[in-house]
A protein has these predicted regions:
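Conserved thiamine diphosphate
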Residues: 1-20, 171
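Thiamine diphosphate
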Residues: 19-172
Length: 172
């Protein structure tokens, strides 16, 4: 399962999955237009990327697809409060990309944000994988509370579900 964050990644991964990959494969991509913050991200062809890493960052903000916009904004908000964080954007979701746990085990805190339900989600899988590799840090998981969902636009839903940048920062 792959979740490109912008049109460039969508084109790249769609071509790769159709022409080179074998077996079942899926792309998860949000409907609607391409957000400017996400459009600015390069398509590296990597299965995950650390976006503009900061020396000494002890916090990793992790997400995928359209929610990447919120972790980028959260990184900027945290920096305004003197907290250095790195953003890790997953493109391959399942199975988790090789090497992602090795990259993340150097952080004290990992906040994973995803716009799906908690149970059985990618964040839950990553939390388990981090535990299995011996990581002893704090894992924070922000997901959708499916006991109530508003009829609202995406920014309103993100705010209600505490998946917007401001809400992500409150746990750090």
């Amino acid at each position: 399962i792959f979740a490109p964050a912008n049109y460039a990644e969508l084109r790249y991964w769609l071509t790769y999955l159709v022409r080179k990959a074998h077996g079942p494969r899926m792309i998860r991509y949000a409907r609607g237009g391409e957000n400017p913050a996400l459009a600015a991200l390069p398509c590296t062809g990597a299965r995950y990327d650390v976006l503009d890493p900061v020396d000494g960052a002890r916090v990793a903000l992790v997400s995928y697809g359209a929610e990447t916009e919120e972790i980028i904004a959260a990184k900027d908000l945290l920096a305004q409060h003197g907290v250095q964080a790195d953003c890790v954007k997953l493109t391959q979701l399942y199975p988790l990309p090789v090497g992602v746990c090795d990259t993340l085990k150097h952080y004290d805190t990992i906040l994973f944000a995803e716009d799906t339900v908690r149970t059985g989600g990618i964040g839950e899988q990553l939390g388990f994988a981090m535990q299995q590799c011996g990581w002893q840090g704090e894992f924070l998981l922000h997901t959708v509370d499916n006991s109530h969902l508003l009829h609202a636009n995406v920014p309103e839903l993100r705010k209600d579900q505490q998946l917007d940048a401001a809400a992500l920062c409150t746990d750090i």
